[in-house]
Amino acid sequence: VRLLRRRPKTFDIQVHDLLLHVTTAEDVEDEARAAALSSWEQLQAYALQHPEFRTSERPIPVPREAPAIVREVCRAAVRAGVGPMHAFRGAVVDQVGRFLARNVTEVVVRCGGDHFIATRRRMKLTVHRGAAGPIALVVGPHREGVGVSTTAGRGRAGAVPDALAVLAASCVLADAAAAGVEALLGEEGGLAAALRYLRRVPGVLGGLVLVDERIGVAGGVELAA
């Protein structure tokens, strides 16, 4: 991701099994690390105490007394129609990105294929698709931040999109919706069903799905020239 005109500060944060890559214009590594650790610990603690949060492949009721990040995960899972853990990584990325965006004008937080992007201008995000070569999406401007979840090759749900990108109002929702798309791609007529799904999930801004020689676009996705 190419983002900043100034020389950016880039650093990595390892939080247990998650490796986050952060790009900003400011030295905020300590703040980012604290936010990532707090988010991971809250989600992990809740998952250990509530097995259904960890194991369910379907949405579960939003728990009123749970930490805010747990409620956000459950709400995203309900919207996307998937189990809560499909939004775990996106939730951590979201929390770190939104925390930093309070005081930093442009920031990118990435973990695997999940991105939080806050930018005042248009930028390109590269989505890799194996031997066919990469494809680039135009993202921004999104001053408050936007979530993008991408997958190349075998997806988490066992489907095999050549490339997948979901844009949403938050990374936690993008992560959950990407899992929903992957589940549909394993069915007959999966590409068309996946595009219909992306159009109807509240908060999803758009998506790109490539399967074999076919490409599908839903919503406000702009391909770079």
Language model: regions and residue ranges:
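Mature catalytic core of soluble alpha/beta enzymes
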Residues: 1-11, 17-225
